[in-house]
Amino acid sequence: LLVRFEKLLESDAPLAEVLPSIYKQHEERYAGYTLRQLCQEMHDLYARHNVKQLQKEMFRKEHFPRVSMNPQEANYAYLRGEVELVRLPDAEGRIAAEGALPYPPGVLCVVPGEIWGGAVLRYFSALEEGINLLPGFAPELQGVYIEEHDGRKQVWCYVIKPRDAQSTLLKGEKL
């Protein structure tokens, strides 16, 4: 299968022949495209965002997100509704209410109670750009949500509300 793919790449085969279902779903975007063009755009996207380095940093201790809250406490806050859904750029510096996982690699990159930022935020931002630039090739994402606004898909996530914004009606509530 890999040898066949390499031959298709070398011959610069039309995308409509190589990936017909994706081509049909996004014909306007990929009209006249070849496999080599698509691969080059993917490569350029990952190089522009230095995704290889971001993937390394996300799983090295010195780059882990800062822990601000016990994961169980963050989960309880989520269950009590002490959260707000924000666009990914607005999550920077905020406490994650849910774990976020892109597949691949299929490993949590931020867990409840950690601060959104650094390599994790930049990685998810790169994925958001890829979802928009290359329709049909979106990774599976868990713990974040894709919503379309003004013709663009945006990544949103739940973060813990600041203490002063949380409802006073919840005082004394126990789970």
Which residues fall in each region the model found?
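Non-catalytic terminal extensions of PLP-dependent enzymes
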Residues: L1-L175
